[in-house]
Every structure is written in C-alpha cells, then in structure tokens.
C-alpha cells in the first residue's frame, strides 16, 4: 500500500521524502519498528514516540507521521508526514490500513459514567437471541467469535480497535457493540468511522484528574463528541446532563427513561426478591398509538438495572428483534463482576460488584437497601498507590450505608495492605458503622459467609471481574468467585 493511500480524512504535509512510498506495515509502538513500516509518533503520558524517530529511520522505516519536529540522520531517505495531531491521524490511517471494516459493520457505541459495561452485554445478549452475530469491545474484554481477549483499556487505541473490527468482520459479525470511554473520545480512538447508534447512559463527576480530564466541563464535552459521530443517538431523558451532552449533536435523537415523555419508558416497576436472588420487573412502553406494552424481568437489582435494560431495548428496536427474544435474553443475562449474584445459600444473598469508589459504592448500597435485608454487609478494600481520599470516602460511605463492614485487601500494589486498611478505618470511624478488618481477602470473605444471618445481603465489592491481586508489581491469580467456591468446598468437607 502506498503511503498516500493511508492519508485520507485529515490534513497532512509531506515535509521530507515521497508520499508515494510503499508501506509494508503500520506501527505506533517503537518496539515493533521494522524495515518498510510507517511509524506513527504518539505523544503518550509517560513516553513520547517522537524521541524514537531517529531509531525508526536507522531501522529502515519507510515513513514517519509526526506532529512536531524530529531529529533524523541526514543520510536517511525516510518520508516524514507532518500532521496537527498524530493520534487523530492514526485513527484514519488505521481504518485505511485495515480496509475500513467498520463500513461493513453496524457499530453501536455506549458512553456514560455508569452502565456502559452492563448495557453492552445486554445488547449483545438480545441481538444474539435474535440470530445476529455480535462482537463486543469493553472494559472487561473484547469478544470475537469464541475468542475472549482481556482488555487493557475500556476503549482500545484506534489501531487495535480497527484490527478488532477487521477480525470481527472476518469472523462473520454483523454488529459490534462497544463501550466508548470519555478518555477514548478525547484521544480520538474512535475516529475514522461513524457509529450506527450512540447511547448516553448518565453522567456524574468522575475521571477528573491530571491523567484524565482537567475538570467536569471537559469530561462532559468529551462525552458529547459521540453524538457528532453517529447516525442515531439514544439518550437517557432523565439525566440532568443530557441536554448539555447532546448540545451540537449532528444525529437524530431518541430517548429512554422513567419519564413518560421518553420515546421508550418503564412503568409498573416491581422489586423481585427470591431466596438467594434479587431482581427487578417492569413494563416496557413506547410512545405512539398502537404500541402494546410488554413485561420484562432482569435478574439484577435496582433502578439502574431498569435504565440499562431500557437502553438495550431501545437499541434493539432498530433491528429485527421480537419482544419474546428480549424477554428471554434479559432474564438470562449476567455480567461478570457487575452486581453478579453468586449462588451460596437460600438463606442470604451474596453479590460481587466492581464498585471501587465512594460514588459507586453508595449507589450500590442504596439500591440494595430497597430490598429490606436483615443486614446489609459490605466487604471491600482499596487499591494501593491511588488517592488516599478514595479510602476515607469509601470507609465513610460504607459506615453510613451498610449495617456491617468487612475491611480487607484489594490490589495493594507497592503499599502495605495494613496501611491502606488503616486509611479506610479512618473514614469509617467518622460514622457509627460497625466493622472488622481482616487483611487476607479469602479469610474476610469466609468470615462474611460464616457470620451471615437469614435475610442478609452481602456485597463483595472492588474487584468485580478481576482475576488477580497486584502486589509489588506482580499480578497473582485471585478471583472472588474462586475464593467463594474454595470456602464452600472447605465448609462442606468440614461437615
């Protein structure tokens, strides 16, 4: 492929060499530079790819894509393409390099503070029940046919995303459903194609910091970029930020929510509380004459489960899907580490969730309180080498909203777990919350199970889908589900 053929969709200038050069491969990782490749110099948070420009020339790269001046050997015949933003350019270059696979797929993108992961799996579940072949890209994993690829980022770099699209097309996928993080939008990872449908779930202050968004206004603005890059936007009418997020949109808009003015809304909401299980049941109604309501049940608790299901239903209305297929798919849906119920006993309920900050823990505990448990038991730790404020806040939230807290270890990283636990205790001591600290996570879970009372709800929070514990730079195998299974087996053997 000639260099020029990769340079469509953005402005560029050839400042050295010849844009007609043949390109054998496209790379953005300096460790993968090969003779004849195009090396895209990306400004990362820790490493600037421009510092490897000279090395690329020496290794025989055919072309560089840069956004600032670079030093090159004077004898090198390398081609240099100057652009305003090399990340933006990389998205278009990657799409061209892989043959624009998204043009032959219907790509559905979901953005929002909460609900992205669950909504992607619900959409995938419904569409597959209706006979479609669906790829998925998200926080937990990328799914291509039978392959499950663990995720590094919620939204992969544009090159990897386009590679996934190509592989999904080759696998025979019709549709791709993906989480679209605000950071991914900010860094242009989803440029180079147009989404068939964009969904907005909700917005709350989060991901504000030196490595993410400067302030809430930037966070909001980045979410809104999705609605200038899709044909149809489906948004939560009930969220206070919806108008701001969709300001300047270039797509048609539809709404979902509990508000009866939404295009699709929930009515007659009922909590489902069965032995060892929690869920929610509601009627789905659509505005317009002749639309007959139908009932769905979701095996996940809380109002946010209604919103996640409504978003999925609203999307699937644009495909050939029967109501009965929606009902069956939702009833059987489960998302790993997202209010995931683990069958342990019909006397109490045990859930695993990824809630790892004060906001998500408060939302979860408030939701579970609606089910009137005998006790609401919260078990969690906090990650090391992260904000200490998060520890104080999570301790205070658990002390205020749970009846009993079991403080334990999460991913201590390079800190001592006992020090992290002390920080959490500082937060909980601001409340009258009863608590115990057990550093070993398996022992902590065993304690919570052994002390459970009939009607209790126990939430094991923080790690969710993770299957490791990070200590001193090493990730050791650890999965809350496996720990629970081991504990139950040990109890059974003890008689």
Predicted feature residues:
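N-terminal leader/targeting and accessory segments in enzymes
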Residues: 1-92, 228, 240, 262-270, ...
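Phosphate-binding loop of NTP-binding sites
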Residues: 10, 90-233, 237, 241-249, ...
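Structural beta-sheet core signal
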Residues: 136, 178, 198, 235, ...
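ATP-dependent carboxylate-amine ligase
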Residues: 1-14, 35-38, 250, 289, ...
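Short glycine-rich anion-binding loops that position phosphate/pyrophosphate groups of nucleotides
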Residues: 44-46, 182-183, 204-207, 239-240, ...
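Alpha-helical segments flanking ligand/cofactor-binding loops in enzyme cores
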Residues: 31, 54, 125, 166, ...
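Acidic, Mg2+-coordinating active-site environments of NTP-dependent enzymes
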Residues: 3, 10, 70-76, 171, ...
């Amino acid at each position: 492929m000639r260099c020029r053929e990769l340079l469509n969709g953005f402005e560029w200038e050839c400042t050295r060499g010849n844009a007609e050069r043949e390109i054998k491969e496209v790379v953005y990782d300096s460790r993968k530079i090969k003779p004849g490749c195009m090396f895209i110099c990306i400004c990362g948070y820790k490493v600037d790819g421009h510092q490897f420009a000279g090395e690329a020339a020496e290794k025989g790269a055919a072309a560089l894509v840069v956004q600032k001046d670079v030093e090159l050997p004077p004898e090198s015949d390398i081609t240099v393409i100057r652009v305003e933003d090399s990340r933006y350019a990389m998205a278009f270059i990657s799409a061209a390099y892989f043959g624009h696979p998204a043009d032959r797929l219907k790509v559905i993108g979901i953005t929002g503070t909460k609900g992205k992961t669950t909504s992607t799996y619900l959409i995938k579940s419904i569409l597959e029940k209706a006979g479609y072949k669906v790829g998925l890209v998200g926080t937990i994993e990328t799914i291509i046919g039978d392959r499950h690829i663990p995720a590094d980022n919620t939204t992969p770099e544009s090159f990897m995303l386009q590679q996934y699209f190509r592989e999904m097309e080759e696998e025979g996928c019709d549709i791709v459903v993906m989480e679209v993080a605000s950071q991914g939008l900010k860094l242009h990872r989803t440029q180079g194609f147009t989404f068939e449908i964009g969904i907005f779930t909700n917005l709350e202050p989060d991901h504000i910091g030196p490595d993410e968004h400067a302030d809430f206004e930037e966070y909001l603005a980045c979410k809104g970029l999705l609605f200038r890059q899709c044909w149809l936007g489906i948004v939560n009418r009930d969220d206070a930020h919806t108008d701001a997020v969709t300001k300047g949109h270039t797509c048609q808009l539809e709404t979902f929510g509990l508000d009866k003015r939404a295009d699709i809304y929930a009515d007659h909401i009922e909590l489902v509380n069965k032995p060892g299980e929690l869920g929610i049941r509601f009627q789905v109604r659509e505005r317009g004459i002749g639309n007959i309501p139908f009932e769905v049940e979701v095996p996940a608790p809380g109002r946010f489960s209604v919103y996640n299901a409504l978003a999925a239903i609203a999307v699937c209305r644009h495909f050939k899907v029967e109501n009965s297929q929606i009902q069956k798919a939702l009833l059987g849906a489960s998302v790993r580490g997202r209010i995931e119920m683990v069958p342990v006993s019909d006397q109490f309920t045990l859930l695993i969730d990824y809630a790892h900050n004060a906001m998500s823990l408060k939302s979860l505990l408030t939701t579970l309180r609606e089910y009137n448990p005998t006790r609401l038991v919260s078990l969690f730790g906090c990650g090391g080498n992260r904000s200490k404020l998060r520890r104080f806040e999570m301790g205070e939230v658990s002390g205020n909203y749970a009846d009993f807290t079991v403080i334990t270890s999460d991913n201590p990283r390079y800190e001592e777990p006992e020090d992290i636990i002390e920080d959490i205790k500082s937060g909980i001591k601001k409340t009258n919350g009863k608590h115990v600290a057990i550093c070993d996570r398996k022992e902590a879970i065993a304690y919570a199970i052994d002390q459970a009372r009939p009607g209790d709800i126990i939430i094991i929070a923080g790690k969710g889908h993770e299957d490791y514990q990070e200590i001193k730079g090493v990730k050791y195998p650890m999965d809350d589900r496996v720990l629970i299974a081991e504990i139950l087996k040990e109890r059974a053997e003890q008689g």
